[in-house]
Amino acid sequence: MGVTKKPDLNDPVLRAKLAKGMGHNYYGEPAWPNDLLYIFPVVILGTIACNVGLAVLEPSMIGEPADPFATPLEILPEWYFFPVFQILRTVPNKLLGVLLMVSVPAGLLTVPFLENVNKFQNPFRRPVATTVFLIGTAVALWLGIGATLPIDKSLTLGLFQIQIDLEILR
């Protein structure tokens, strides 16, 4: 773990800031009652008003009625399950697919132990966490977009289809 520097209480600048009440809360205002009684209810009521306003102005229409005799060609899950659906769809062994899905949170749990930094540092000074985030986001987007395509184009996203067609024609 990183070594944290203890504050020098003999420093006159620090003592002046602490005397003004700038130690724990930088602005010097207590959270009670200002924030909890006045600001939070306004934010909560504003959020509820925005939700009600959107529900009134843009109501969510119910789709066409279900027809049990006409099923779609491919059933897709909700958009936030697309990467998981793509993993299960492309991996031939279902147990391996489930193990891949379990390995994602297990791998993310190991990231804090790989870096020995202070938790308040800049993300650019934490290269492992930044790299894991960027690669994970790219892979999740790749899998999510691929889940909406047919199975033969899902891994390449249809980007290499022209080259494959040209090789078949030769």
Curated annotation (Swiss-Prot):
SUPFAM superfamilies associated with the record:
a domain/subunit of cytochrome bc1 complex (Ubiquinol-cytochrome c reductase)
The answer on whether this UniProt entry bears the keyword NADP reads no
Which terms in the Gene Ontology molecular function aspect does this entry carry? electron transporter, transferring electrons within cytochrome b6/f complex of photosystem II activity; electron transporter, transferring electrons within the cyclic electron transport pathway of photosynthesis activity; oxidoreductase activity
Q: Which Gene3D superfamilies match?
A: plastocyanin oxidoreductase (1.10.287.980), Single helix bin (1.20.5.510)
GO BP annotations listed: photosynthetic electron transport chain
**Repressor as a keyword?**
no
Q: What is its main location?
A: plastid
Location in the cell: Plastid, Chloroplast thylakoid membrane
Membrane spanning segments where?
36-56, 95-115, 131-151
Q: Provide the topology term for how it sits in the membrane.
A: Multi-pass membrane protein
Cellular component GO terms held in the UniProt record: chloroplast thylakoid membrane
- Provide the alphabetized UniProt keywords: Chloroplast, Electron transport, Membrane, Photosynthesis, Plastid, Thylakoid, Transmembrane, Transmembrane helix, Transport
HAMAP family, alphabetically?
Cytb6_f_subIV (MF_01344)
**Biological function:** Component of the cytochrome b6-f complex, which mediates electron transfer between photosystem II (PSII) and photosystem I (PSI), cyclic electron flow around PSI, and state transitions.
The annotated subunit structure for this chain is: The 4 large subunits of the cytochrome b6-f complex are cytochrome b6, subunit IV (17 kDa polypeptide, petD), cytochrome f and the Rieske protein, while the 4 small subunits are petG, petL, petM and petN. The complex functions as a dimer.
Q: Which family does it belong to?
A: Belongs to the cytochrome b family. PetD subfamily.
> What name is this protein filed under?
Cytochrome b6-f complex subunit 4
Q: Which organism is it from?
A: Nymphaea alba
